[in-house]
Amino acid sequence: MSSDESDAASNKEEDTTLSDDDGSDVEIKNSKKDRKRKLASESEKSGSDDDDDDDDDEDENVTSKKSKKQKRKNKAPSGRDFLAWDVEVDDEDEDDDNDYDDEDDPSMNAMNEREEAERAMKEMELSQRNRDRYKFQNMTEDEVQKYFENKYKGDKNDSQYDDEDSAMDDISKNSHLPSTKDPNLWIVKCRMGEEKLVAMHLMRKCLAVEHTNEPFQIKSVVVKEGLKGMIYIEAFKQSHVMSAIEGFSALNQFTITMVPIKDMVDVLRVVKDIPQLKLGSYVRLKRTMYKDDLAVVDLVDIAQNRVNLKLIPRVDYQKRRGAMRTDADKNYKLKRRPMPKLFDQDTIKEVGGEIVTDGDFLVFEGNHFRRGFLYKYFPINAIQADGVKPTLGELEKFQESSDDLKRELETASLKDTENPFVPGDIVEVKAGELVNLRGKVMTVDGTKVVMMPDQEDLKEAITLNAHELRKYFKEGDHAKVISGRYEGHTGLIVRVKDSTAIVLSDLGMEELKVRVRDLQLCADVTTGVDSLGQFQYHDLVQLDHTGNVGVIVRLEKEHLEVLNMHGVVNRIKPQAIIAKKDVRFAKVLDSQNNSIEAKDLVKVIGGPNAKERETDEDPVGEVLYAFRGTVFVYSRKVTKNGGVLVCKPKQLILQGAKKTTSTPMVSRMASPNPMASPRHSSGGMTPRSPQDGMSSRGSSGGQTPRQGGGGGRGGHFGTANQQKVRRDLTLIGKNVRIIKGPMKGHFGIVRDATEDTVRVELHTQCRTISVDRARVMVVGDTGITAGSGGGSSFYSSSKTPMRDSGKTPMYGSKTPMYGAQTPMYGSMTPAYDGGRTPAYGEGGRTPAYGSKTPAYGDLDEHSSSRTPAYGNDSSRTPAYGSADGARTPAYGSTEGGRTPAYGSMDNSRTPAYDDSGRTPGYESMPSRTPNYDSSSKTPAYPESEHSARTPAYNNDYDIPLSPAYEPDAPEAYDNAPARTPAFVSRTPGYDTYENSSPTYEPDAATKVEEDIGDTSSPTYDSPPHSYVVPTPGAMLNPATPGAYHVDTPGFAAPMTPGSGGAYDQYVAPSPFAGYDSNNYNNADGAIEQIPDHFLAQGVWIVQNLCVQIKDHEGRFNGREAIIKDVTDGKVDVYMPDHKCNLEVDFDQLTPMKPQPGDDARVIFGQDAGHSGQLVSMDGFEAVIRSQEDMSDMRVINIGLCCKMHSET
């Protein structure tokens, strides 16, 4: 029977069945059974035919037949498998039915199967349409209802089978549960941290004895992750466990506990920790670039184990993208995390970034942004949801308005933390009918709070929910922070607004912004000790192994803030601190060489911590520590960094110490004023007077200049050797009383003393303080203080002899006094006769007797007045005879022992010169200093006698000479070195003539003798060497000698300005002939400069200021930048030239000078903060007109202004 005939028969049978009158489901099932029987008969016939065909192949190999069967089983199912009416027949001929395919070709099999499946599907669709068409024609409504009920109601047999399957599953699971026949679990105590190590040792020991006569009887060892101090051992008996752990010191053999059978399953059960995330809750990231950043949960997808977070993006705005990308940008690697900042699409477009829009979102580099925030999916295990407490600063960044922040603070859930209320708290009702009702908490029971109202009409306690209350504080309350970042701090509440409070800390005197619920009324003051009790407030700690130290300025719950030696605050954990430092006995010298140490009171006079305006007071504080040239000072008036200042010793001055008036001996090269005269070792006091307030002890005034004092061999150049502080042993050990200052009235014993300061150990206090010597008096003395220097001087002969009215000082010829006016007619210094300074005459010269330095004369002169005094014997200083070379400087008449040594005709002079180049020189004697060639005389002069003496003089004019000159002086005077002071310049000089041009005439020196009123002034050639000493003070109107401690010329090897070194920028020649444009001030001479320390602090930096970049990458240095934002000590600027953003530090910015028409802002001075438009400039003065008030126009120094970026 063919397949077409069978199909037609089946269709005919189907039509016949559907046309029956009963139309019941039973007949439909019978028709299906008949159809299945026919198909089965057809398959038997085809099977019999196949059997006949297979008789010829009976001799084939059995192995080949089995392999074919296996291949048939592995083939894809045929189309017949998809037919619902196909039934299985008996299994007798199952092996034969598998060989229905003609060939084993896979392609042929697939093609045949596809054709059969398509034909079968067409037949099913046709039959289904026919059944749906005629199914309900002859059925009543009840029959149709019954049909659908039977079709869709549940099958009881199916549910029965499901119950049986579940029961089998339960039985199979229960079979794995431990029973009494299984080994037990035993708990063994273990040393903390060695659980895994012990398990490994047990395994090795078990393997070692496995094949011996006594193997271990334990089955397994279990170590649970996170469970410290115990392990589990599986064994039948406790004795088996004890024998296995014998010899392990890390295990406790005497405490072995068995786990109950019912609890054994829970021991090894692994519970997946899924955080309970809620929409809008705050979380933190554990890893990625956003580690420790705060985020808000936006969507939770538990199925895919991820969560969508809203957070502040970290986008690198400096990286060029797209078409603007260069070869250098291709190798660009992000070295640091970008700053968190809201997404700025304009900046991204400027660097070449491409942004697309997806609804409300902006898509950039695969990330979605909305309203500046980043929305991104993260794995759930990458976030931390427990214990997240955002700070107020972080909450402000996430809130789009102040109302959102207020709402966030007010609706902060109390369920996440413990009940913040305790009995005794003052609370206020924030919601409900009793809003704003205040009272006192009586008891707390879970989330219920019993409050006693403070109203007179309400005398009964009220029970309220905790979330309906909030703590109430008023200004002036003393509170303690019980949670949060500032936990443990105490302070005074200075302001309360909504749910936040401003607390003034007791330790650092700084304002803390905390939430009200984190506060609690407290009468105690914090001890300033951290939670571990290891460090204390204001402790000096070592930060690293390089010697960097710092002072603790803030204590937090888990961190410390340390102010290091460089003035930078580091926030570190206590574990990062190496050790505490003990430098209580360290001492340093302040700017006046006073010794300061811990607990001394000092004043800050320089550096970044000095006063910013002249009207302000200098900061005063107590020395906390002195360490390696760094002093930590605590000032109560400073709130920054807890009042701790980092200063250098030279920026401080000891309070109560007398300022030293003497100028330390420095060389010309180190002089702060290049026009000053060369300095003497005695600071210009030659000889030194006892009325200068200083002891002559240790003084070099009036002594013979030391060997090498001119910078030659043995010279000191003003080093510490000459400034050494000497101790006064006469006062040590005496009882003194403080008569002045803050410690007035205290008694003590002197432990150490110098010329200016004494160290007094107080009797009433266990401390030693430094006191000015003038403020203490020895007990038992009658009103005599322990003045500077204490006892007598070393030498009485070092002072200027005082024996008549012509001496200085003395009445009659004192300076100033009548007849000694300065200036007076003729520019005399002082007036003629006995008022000259220093006066000359008998014994009145400076130094006395012949005005020689060192003074000497003939053998019959008074030897006691010489400085130093000497006679004709070896007591001279240094002693010398008339012909030996021991003079100071030693020289003979013709030898080269002079200083500088030279011969009479050679070029070894300093500097070398010929006979006509002495300065100031006359005649042809070979001992003038300094000297150089004739073309550069200072001042120039002819070789006539008395023509170029310094100062110039003539017997015909009553012009005083300094030092005094006598025509009949010994010849040694005329042969002495060059005289001082200068040529023609009277002291103090004034000229009645108006013309003072610094021109030079060759016979200028001669004209002085002929006409003292000559107005010509000499000019000078540049010295041939930088160490040539010029004639001091020419045309500079020098002051009265001695008033400014004028040193002996030539001493300490003065350096000619302009020859390099420290004063290379001062190009004025010497002698000075007028100001040059490149001198001390700028060209305009009046532009005010902003201190560098003020610029480095960054307090002047505001948005839209135009600045210049320095100390950065080469392509950015010197470029203009516009300030966009200031965050966490960093400045975010925009570079118009590079069209990119840049992050810099405060000290990398300098303000730009505005031009007329620019917007400007005053950043320093009394008008700081004033802004407007720069209307005009007149030199250094700028006229700035305020944009708010057009009538407000101010004239401000241009050096105090900075250009502002204009939006228009």
Swiss-Prot record:
It is found in: Nucleus. Residues 420-447, 473-506, 595-629, 730-763 form the KOW domain. PANTHER family: SUPPRESSOR OF TY 5, TRANSCRIPTION ELONGATION FACTOR SPT5. Residues 16-25, 49-61, 87-106 have a biased composition (Acidic residues). The lineage of its organism: Eukaryota, Metazoa, Ecdysozoa, Nematoda, Chromadorea. This is Transcription elongation factor SPT5. Signal peptide: none annotated. Residues 679-694, 926-938 have a biased composition (Polar residues). CDD domains: KOW_Spt5_1, KOW_Spt5_2, KOW_Spt5_3, KOW_Spt5_4, KOW_Spt5_5, KOW_Spt5_6, NGN_Euk. The modification Phosphothreonine is found at T815, T822.
